[in-house]
Amino acid sequence: MNKQKGLSVKSVVAIGIGAAIYVILARFTSIPTGIPNTNIEIVYPFLALLATIYGPVVGFSVGFIGHALGDFLMYGQTWWSWVLATAVLGLIIGLYGMRLDLDNGVFTVKQMVGFNVVQIIANVISWLLIAPVGDILIYSEPQNKVFLQGATATITNSLSILILGTILLKAYAATKVKKGSLRKD
């Protein structure tokens, strides 16, 4: 039996297209919060969709590449602590997404609740732990500033994924034929 090594072509394409769309969404759909360098981001529901459909490697890669490119193109420099936080967000959501059966048209209320519990935990890990601690260790940023940014990002990103991410996942599942729904006449 010939076992495939590495990423599938489908995953590589998803990473490339996903990262490009990530950069475009980050550039044109960010809504300022009033907290410096912290926005309401529409890109995170998109990342959650890709991570859930294609898995943790694609989620991590799209988050990492998309955020790194977006930072560089928009600001001329990359904030690696936030890039890593985004990648970890995609990874965790992708790991949970492996438990879902979206390709068979299934996304129940119980699964929606589970997805949102996991994405909120992933946002807390990413924005209240990885990003602020990274900012302190890498960039010597003041604690009060980075934890305020992290708390704001946690709340806004969790809410955007809760609302838009859930809608995207439900819409995606609705486009798939439910397993066993077709019968022979």
UniProtKB/Swiss-Prot annotation:
PANTHER family: UPF0397 PROTEIN BC_2624-RELATED (PTHR37815), UPF0397 PROTEIN SPR0429 (PTHR37815:SF3). Belongs to the UPF0397 family. It is a multi-pass membrane protein. GO terms for cellular component: plasma membrane. Gene3D superfamilies: 1.10.1760.20. InterPro entries: ECF_substrate-spec-like (IPR009825), UPF0397 (IPR022914). Its main location: membrane. It is found in: Cell membrane. The keyword Cell membrane applies. The keyword Transmembrane helix applies. Keywords: Cell membrane, Membrane, Transmembrane, Transmembrane helix. This is UPF0397 protein LGAS_1499.
